[in-house]
Amino acid sequence: MATTVAPSSSLWTPSWKTSAFGIILLICLCLIIYGIYKVIRICIIPAAMTATPAGELLVHINYYKKAKIYYNQINFYVLLSGLKMCLFEVAKK
């Protein structure tokens, strides 16, 4: 006489190993997407910007803005050092 086997459940419950593997896979996928984003941002966009005259103009405008900011900062520090020297001269007298 054949033995009867209880029917198995149709729902699959993952073990902790499967869940951990899924989380690791998700983290790896996020890191890959982030790496692709960084490559595009650092390598491809600047290369594309310098390949066209309009892009070169944008690069030069960006450099000009940065240089202007640094120039203003230097002028501010020179002004402060000049004020300090004046104050020391007044304090000496």
From Swiss-Prot:
Protein name: Uncharacterized gene 28 protein
Species this chain originates from: Saimiriine herpesvirus 2 (strain 11) (SaHV-2)
